Amino acid sequence: MKPDRDSLDEFFEYEAEDFLVYLALLITEGRTPEHSVKGRTEGPHCPPAQLSQPAPNKHECSDKLAQCREARKTRSEVAFLWRNNIPIMVEVMLLPDCCYSDEGANTDGNDLNDPALKQDALLLERWTLEPVPRQSGDRFIEEKTLLLAVRSFVFFSQLSAWLSVSHGAVPRNILYRVSAADEELKLNFSHSPTEHVFPVPNVSHNVALKVSVQSLPRQSSYPVLNCSIHSNLGFYEKKILPREHSVTQPHNSQDNDQNSAPVSQHAFTKPSWSVGPEGLLHARTNVSTDLSLPVRNSKLLSTVDKGYSIGTPPSKHQCFSMTGNYKAAPQEPVRNFKSFSLVGVPCSPQASQTVETNPLIGSLIQERQEVIARIAQHLLQCDQTSSQINSHSIINELSSINGKIKNSSEDEKFQKKNKESPPICTSTLALTLSTGNQISNLKKAPDTPINSSRPILEFHTSPNPQARRKLILFESNEHFCNPFQSSGQSTVPSSNNENINKLPEKRDIKQSEHGEISTRTGNQLSNSCNTNDRLCTNTQIVPEDKSCTDSFHKPQKDNPKICSQKVGHRNGQAQETTCRETRKSDHSNQLLSIENCINKDRDNIQYKEPQDKLKSVHDENEDPTNCDCLAQGQRKCNGNCLQRSESLKNTEQKPIQLRHSCTWKKQTFRSLDGISTKAFHPRTGLPLLSSPVPQRKTQSGYFDLDNSLLKLKGLSTQRQHVNGFTDEDTVATNKQLSSSAPPAPCLSLLGNFEESVLNYRFEPLGVVEGFTAEVGASGIFCPTHMTLPVKVSFYSVSDDNAPSPYMGNITLESLGKRGYRIPPSGTIQVTLFNPNKTVVKMFVVKYDLRDMPANHQTFLRQRTFSVPVRRETKGAVTENGLKAEDRTLRYLIHLRFQSSKSGKIYLHRDVRLLFSRKSMEVDSGAAYELKSYIETPTNPQYSPRC
């Protein structure tokens, strides 16, 4: 009956539903791209490699994180399918980088109904998780073994190889889809896939799990994916030429080139935009565009009510049309538009003319109208880190493409209309781009999209205080004009550049890696709107009437105000300005207490220091020690702050003591760093820790104590009441003690050094930190290996302070109340590492506890001796015939076992070791070998648990 019980209870450490979720999350998050040498990492929701080991930093999900939302969605989908006994399918696919966003790794399953997405996606893997009836007979593998196999497959997959080679740059748009496996397949492999079937584990008493994966064959190079929009560019070139096609041609003059907007209300109510392979912004309409300058990091969101229509000619003015209220703040000079909204409103009625489209082209555009509008919401620009391209090559490539479109779309009738009625531009926004010295000065803008529907501009600032630069604040009820904007003018006034350059030297505005307005305007456009731009270092946006004090300059048109102090609210009534004074000594210890004092004295500081006293404005790059804000408040609390920091510092320096059965003296329980004389030999001065284990010439061979130890002056007085270890004294001691007597304040030493140390009867001379041990077991199942810290101590046991073996203690309390679960019979392996991560000893212990009753306990001790080799009598000498004085104890391991009520076997409480710090197998000059002996209690072998 016991094997049946083991087969039913032994291997199911996880619930079946949780195990399915682990597998799904490992597939979807096991290859999260990151910019590193490895190129990928496991997401925070992936199961750890060692589930039994406590995680150092446990992840807490937040609804604000997209990855957490996707993980929660995956959990719910997998749980729903599993509860309904439906096979689960996970598809891994790639999308082109040009027309799909790289922010979201997952998308709704409904989007796969889109014919354009079906055509654009490249299917890499198709995983199938199918519940099957429980396997009969011998078990195949455990759930954890399957988890490791899936992790290994994910690690060595084609997708991981691409990420590793590119250091996380490509692929960027990875799509995961969780669905029912019995649904109709919406995507097919481009080549015949290879299939791998994993071993089938049992996940419950009557259900097993079959996991299989179909993957695309390995490819030597990364495939270049083109979306359906860009791949049909040649189709338009071939079809437009033989057909009659009327399009409004922009009027070319010697001064500037102006491109009109799309004019077909029916076919272009939602214009399509595309980003080329080099990251260029194109208007995918049938008008001729002249784009010759890269626009980096462009994400375009398509809306119908509000937005922009954007074009970027090389060095001329470009007309824009927009509807509704607009608010945008470019975070660096040109080419870094992060988010704009597109509408299909033409520039002016005069420029709008009906277009006679070809029926074939018109039907194709009408069919893809909704598809293009949805894809346009996720348009993005290739990242600067992925490709660095030359502007001259971009100009040449675009000019050739635009030339083809112009030649194919022009006819005689079209040219006549251009001569008779030139287009009239009525836009209110003009941009000029300078390709000279500004290219090298541009830096990457933050990835925060700026939507025209947002009332307040949002910025993502770096956690590094030095990277927090000046932000642009504006009122939500007024228009915000950027430095690249002009009010209904096609030329740029030069007076605006002078206004910006007239800023004081102390208020110099610098660029940062998170994007900001450069004062080196040169040939750039400047702001011509009548708005008051305020540049501040705070991360809170405060209305203008509450953010500046009377001491600042009065508001003037086209005069930015610069404030380098943090502005905030308290109880919605008033603001406070705080500046923390940097101290050179004990800054880290006093920081917390100083902030607490400042928080307590906020009210006094606000009323005692009015706002009109803030007469000087500091630059954020100046030395913070020059800031004299809150000087009075800090003088008041500095005394208390120093006292509190000292008390806090003292509480953090409490020593950590080992847990044992007797109380050790604080005078003798010291760390290795605090030992002066006892760590070295008093006569020779040599280090005692590196000496070999002393050989005791005694009858027992168990590191017996010498009687001369009792006369030492260096030992503590608590050990002086113990007399010689004779049989008479031992009997007399046993007679004095009874089971009803209370325990002595300090327990006496036991019969030999081994027992005294293992039972914590010795006071340690010091402790050594940094030892670790890897604990594992094998048998009918293999539990997860664990790496645990080892508390190591050493002792003084001889008259010349010769070193003793080290005592190591591995606490299993972190694994739970029961301990470390092991098979009923098998092998336990404990690998000990020193602080240098070098193996000191590998203990391998065989055991058999299959006959151990439930709710019982026992122990096992393995001793390893160095035994001389006698070649002349090899094979004739038995273990019993070996004399005790011929062997020396080298290593020892003490294990404790207990059984639960259901009969499961656990290693519990701790594992105790005796060893030498150095890996000393045998002496080089002697013929010795190591032999191990295992001892267990015999009468009784098992005892009931308390």
Swiss-Prot record:
GO terms for cellular component: nucleus. The keyword Nucleus applies. Residues 34-58, 246-271, 484-524, 547-567 are annotated as: Disordered. Keywords: Nucleus. InterPro entries: Atos-like_C, Atos-like_cons_dom, ATOS_Transcription_Regulators. Residues 247-267, 484-500 have a biased composition (Polar residues). It comes from the Eukaryota. Residues 833-841 are annotated as: Transactivation domain 2 (TAD2). The keyword Nucleus applies. GO terms for biological process: gastrulation with mouth forming second. Residues 749-806 are annotated as: Required for macropage invasion. Residues 24-32 are annotated as: Transactivation domain 1 (TAD1). Its main location: nucleus. Residues 34-43, 503-517, 547-560 have a biased composition (Basic and acidic residues). It is found in: Nucleus. Transcription regulator that syncronizes transcriptional and translational programs to promote macrophage invasion of tissues. The protein contains 2 transactivation domains (TAD). Each of these domains may be required for transcriptional activation of a subset of target genes. This is Atos homolog protein A. The lineage of its organism: Eukaryota, Metazoa, Chordata, Craniata, Vertebrata.
